[in-house]
């Protein structure tokens, strides 16, 4: 018998990569998992090399980044690979989650799989925010100031919590050191949850475009789906290296190339593009505390998704109304991202508020109602 089946360590990898039985009708929408795995490995590797040259001191942080760019061999490549890799990482996460929502991958028996994915998403946002602050450019400083100030919205303990995070009365040297420590640690926590995510996936197998149990029609992972994953990985790497070679600052903010100055406020404080939808939700509510809660619940509401979908059919492949509703949700999410980058003025304030209302209505009102309506139509069709 082959060593890949007899060796206790290799056989474990074999059961995931080689002989894993997968539904034969899986499309390219199921390739985002492998792309995310590649992104995670690249972020870990580039991050470790960057940490060797980074100095987590408020006065030296920006200088150390410029030192990497100009005096470290291929330091510019490492930095741009890491910063642009984060952008691709989030793009694939959003597409991965959109596919899961469309095809009902959050429903039983894959609820644990979905919940661990949402946990990873929450940790990713925390990690990305702290990493962005470590550059300590102008936008990094003010982004850290604005976002950490949101903690003060907490009743009674808010100011004390903010000062605990800052290590002083404002963003200062202890803040950068704490962010660096956590930014280095959290990716390994994400990698650990990713392993649990794979275990949960392996216990019930992958979903498929039809949303049906496909135990009678499966094929091994190798060579069919492994080759399909390889195609998209090479396509991604081509776009990725093209971007970091020719347009490395395209996804960033030029103002972050200026050293952080607490005495000069930028014209507009805007986070990275992958955090803009939730930033728009934060700004849509005038109350500071309610805005913070809305932004937090915009992520946590994904945990309740398995409980608000009452449809008897998994996925939207055969549900016309759900397809239309999901299309509106995707357009609304993109609109939130665009509004998050705009100045706080009319008509962007009103559009942001309407988009925020629709975002929460999709999960709490529209999805349950549409699923109940489609169940009724389904039963009526059976009786005929």
Curated annotation (Swiss-Prot):
Keywords: Electron transport, Heme, Iron, Membrane, Metal-binding, Mitochondrion, Mitochondrion inner membrane, Respiratory chain, Transmembrane, Transmembrane helix, Transport, Ubiquinone
Subcellular location: Mitochondrion inner membrane
Cofactor section: heme b
InterPro entries in the cross-refs: Cyt_b/b6_C (IPR005798), Cyt_b/b6_C_sf (IPR036150), Cyt_b/b6_N (IPR005797), Cytb/b6-like_sf (IPR027387), Cytochrome_b (IPR030689), Cytochrome_b_C_euk/bac (IPR048260), Cytochrome_b_N_euk/bac (IPR048259), Di-haem_cyt_TM (IPR016174)
Record: residues binding a ubiquinone: 202
Molecular function terms, GO-annotated: metal ion binding; ubiquinol-cytochrome-c reductase activity
Bilayer-spanning residue ranges: 32-52, 76-98, 113-133, 179-199, 225-245, 289-309, 321-341, 348-368
Domain of life: Eukaryota
Membrane topology per record: Multi-pass membrane protein
GO cellular component: mitochondrial inner membrane; respiratory chain complex III
CDD domains from the UniProt entry: cytochrome_b_C, Cytochrome_b_N
UniProt key word Cell membrane: no
Main function: Component of the ubiquinol-cytochrome c reductase complex (complex III or cytochrome b-c1 complex) that is part of the mitochondrial respiratory chain. The b-c1 complex mediates electron transfer from ubiquinol to cytochrome c. Contributes to the generation of a proton gradient across the mitochondrial membrane that is then used for ATP synthesis.
Subunit and partners: Fungal cytochrome b-c1 complex contains 10 subunits; 3 respiratory subunits, 2 core proteins and 5 low-molecular weight proteins. Cytochrome b-c1 complex is a homodimer.
Note: Heme 1 (or BL or b562) is low-potential and absorbs at about 562 nm, and heme 2 (or BH or b566) is high-potential and absorbs at about 566 nm.
PANTHER family the UniProt entry points to: CYTOCHROME B (PTHR19271:SF16)
Name of the protein this chain belongs to: Cytochrome b
Organism the protein comes from: Starmerella bacillaris (Yeast)
Gene name, Swiss-Prot/TrEMBL: COB
């Amino acid at each position: 018998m082959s060593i890949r089946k007899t060796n206790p360590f290799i056989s474990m990898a074999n059961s995931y990569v080689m002989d894993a039985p997968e539904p034969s009708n899986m499309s390219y929408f199921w390739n985002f998992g492998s792309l995310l795995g590649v992104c995670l490995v690249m972020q870990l590797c580039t991050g470790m090399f960057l940490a060797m040259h980074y100095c987590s001191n408020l006065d030296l942080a920006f200088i150390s980044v410029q030192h990497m760019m100009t005096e470290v061999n291929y330091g510019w490549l490492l930095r741009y690979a890491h910063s642009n890799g984060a952008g691709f990482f989030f793009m694939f996460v959003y597409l991965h989650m959109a596919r899961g929502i469309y095809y009902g991958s959050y429903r039983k028996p894959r609820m644990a799989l979905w919940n661990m994915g949402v946990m990873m998403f929450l940790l990713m946002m925390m990690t990305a925010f702290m990493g962005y602050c470590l550059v300590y450019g102008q936008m990094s400083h003010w982004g850290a100031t604005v976002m950490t100030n949101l903690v003060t919205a907490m009743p009674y303990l808010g100011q004390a919590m903010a000062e605990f995070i800052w290590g002083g009365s404002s963003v200062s040297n202890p803040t950068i050191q704490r962010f660096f420590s956590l930014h280095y640690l959290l990716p390994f926590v994400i990698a650990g949850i990713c392993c649990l995510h794979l275990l949960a996936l392996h216990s019930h197998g992958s979903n498929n475009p039809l949303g049906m149990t496909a135990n009678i029609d499966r094929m091994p992972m190798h060579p069919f789906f492994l080759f399909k994953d390889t195609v998209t990985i090479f396509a991604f790497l081509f776009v990725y290296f093209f971007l970091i070679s020719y347009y490395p600052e395209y996804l960033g903010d030029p103002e972050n190339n200026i050293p952080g100055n607490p005495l000069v406020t930028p014209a507009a404080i805007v986070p990275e593009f992958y955090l803009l939808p939730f930033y728009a939700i934060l700004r849509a509510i005038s109350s500071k505390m309610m805005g913070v809660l809305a932004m937090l619940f915009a992520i946590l509401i994904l945990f309740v998704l398995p409980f608000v979908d009452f449809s008897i059919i998994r996925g939207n492949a055969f549900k016309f109304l759900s397809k239309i509703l999901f299309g509106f949700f995707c357009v609304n999410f993109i609109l939130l991202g665009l509004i998050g980058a705009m100045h706080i003025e009319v008509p962007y304030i009103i559009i942001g508020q309407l988009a925020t209302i629709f975002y929460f209505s999709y999960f709490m009102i529209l999805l349950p109602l549409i699923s109940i309506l489609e169940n009724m139509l389904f039963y009526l069709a059976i009786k005929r």
